[in-house]
């Protein structure tokens, strides 16, 4: 896949007046995935935008809508949720759950082959998601590490259901072209393009081999030569490549990748049951699958955040404060005074050139003068009242 780097013409576009395209995550042969925002619900989303050549292909658009609706009806935490689909101008698009993390391919590149307990931790949700789809009559057709996402919280989810079928229905797709990823195709997909749940089982079997050994079972000079090898050769035993692989995993891969579909597990449900029996027999510990550290999704998120920061810095205006700003330094908040020091310091200094002490004396002097005058007034009032009472009481004698 081609990673996001420079600016893309669709970035900052608003698809269908609702979905803001923020930054490219990765692109492939038929589509580009962006991180985006549903502005109506204020929800982060992943936007898979199909190549513009499909915009006028009614056969593709019809199948694209049907597959999107079918997957949206599935309710399984191991499947990347589909929220919406649409077409904005020259771009059919799919709106999906945004997984903050990376792909299983990126994890394999970072860490290499996995021990059996880690393989089981990956396969459980993958087979669980496929089982839900198989019960609903859906087939993935393109199970591979690139379509298995790992969140930063350790959730493993399967993505891109039905996309191969939609591309196959397009009138621009040449007859006889093998669709899917050559390394993971089942013999029947290579032979005649047919697929059913057992085809997904074959792809998972190849995936198990790759997780245990670090590479796919068939190699060649071209995708076509790799695809055709599985018509005449069985997938080899992983234990022949990596020491310590339990024979139960060899048997799991052999049963999943039998060249005759009738000899395989019937669907993901049957394969999942066998996987659980193996995990119990070997007493494999529980394991949380880590997300890749340097994923395209993480880089896309960092790029978008840096752009937002730059825009904020360029657009920021200085704030004017007409009043004085006081900045408290770390040392300003001192510990309470010890008992040997006075609790209150004497007030010193000046105000308008006059010593503070003079203000204090003046205020105290003014208070004393007020009290003196109040006492004088009260005394005079008392004398007058007393005289009036005396005169009033002797008035009859005088008369």
Swiss-Prot record:
Keyword annotations of the record: ATP-binding, Cell membrane, Kinase, Membrane, Nucleotide-binding, Phosphoprotein, Serine/threonine-protein kinase, Transferase, Transmembrane, Transmembrane helix
Domain Protein kinase: 19-278
Matches recorded under InterPro entries: Kinase-like_dom_sf, Prot_kinase_dom, Ser/Thr_kinase_AS
GO biological process: regulation of primary metabolic process
Topological region Cytoplasmic: 1-368
TM region positions: 369-389
UniProt: ATP binding residues: 25-33, 48
Transmembrane helix in keyword set: yes
SUPFAM superfamilies registered for this protein in UniProt: Protein kinase-like (PK-like) (SSF56112)
EC number: 2.7.11.1
Regions of this protein lying in the Extracellular compartment: 390-399
Compartment list: Cell membrane
Pfam families the record matches: Pkinase (PF00069)
Family membership noted in the UniProt record: Belongs to the protein kinase superfamily. Ser/Thr protein kinase family.
Descriptive protein name: Serine/threonine-protein kinase PknL
Naturally occurring in which organism (per UniProt): Mycobacterium bovis (strain ATCC BAA-935 / AF2122/97)
């Amino acid at each position: 896949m081609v990673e996001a780097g420079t600016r893309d013409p669709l970035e900052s576009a608003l698809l269908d007046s609702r979905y803001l395209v923020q930054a490219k995550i990765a692109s492939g042969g038929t589509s580009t995935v962006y991180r985006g925002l549903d502005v109506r619900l204020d929800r982060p989303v992943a936007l898979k935008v199909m190549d513009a050549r499909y915009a006028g292909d009614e056969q593709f658009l019809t199948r694209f809508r049907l597959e999107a609706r079918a997957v949206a009806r599935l309710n399984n935490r191991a499947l990347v949720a589909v929220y919406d689909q649409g077409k904005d101008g020259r771009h059919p698009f799919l709106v999906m759950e945004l997984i903050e993390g990376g792909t299983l391919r990126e994890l394999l590149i970072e860490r290499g082959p996995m021990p059996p307990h880690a393989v089981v931790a990956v396969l459980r949700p993958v087979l669980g998601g496929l089982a839900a789809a198989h019960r609903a009559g859906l087939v993935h057709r393109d199970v591979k590490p690139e379509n298995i996402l790992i969140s930063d919280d350790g959730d493993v989810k399967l993505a891109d259901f039905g996309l191969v079928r939609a591309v196959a229905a397009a009138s621009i797709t040449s007859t006889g072209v093998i669709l899917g990823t050559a390394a993971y195709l089942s013999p029947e997909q290579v032979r005649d393009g047919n697929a059913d749940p057992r085809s997904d089982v074959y792809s998972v079997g190849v995936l198990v081999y790759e997780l245990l050994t670090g590479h796919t079972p068939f190699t060649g000079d071209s995708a076509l030569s790799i695809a055709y090898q599985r018509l005449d050769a069985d997938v080899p035993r992983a234990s022949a490549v990596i020491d310590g692989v339990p024979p139960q995993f060899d048997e799991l891969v052999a049963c999943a990748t039998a060249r005759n579909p009738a000899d395989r597990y019937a669907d993901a449900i049957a394969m999942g049951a066998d996987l659980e029996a193996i995990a119990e027999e070997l007493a494999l510990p529980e394991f949380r699958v880590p997300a890749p550290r340097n994923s395209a999704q993480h880089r896309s998120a960092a790029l978008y955040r840096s752009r937002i920061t730059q825009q904020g810095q360029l657009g920021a205006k200085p704030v004017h404060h007409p009043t004085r700003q006081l900045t408290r330094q770390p040392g300003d908040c001192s510990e309470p005074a010890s008992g040997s020091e006075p609790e209150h310091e004497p007030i010193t200094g000046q105000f308008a050139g006059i010593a503070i002490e003079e203000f204090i004396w003046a205020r105290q002097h003014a208070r004393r003068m007020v009290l003196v005058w109040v006492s004088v007034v009260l005394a005079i009032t008392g004398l007058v009242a007393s005289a009036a009472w005396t005169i009033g009481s002797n008035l009859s004698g005088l008369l």
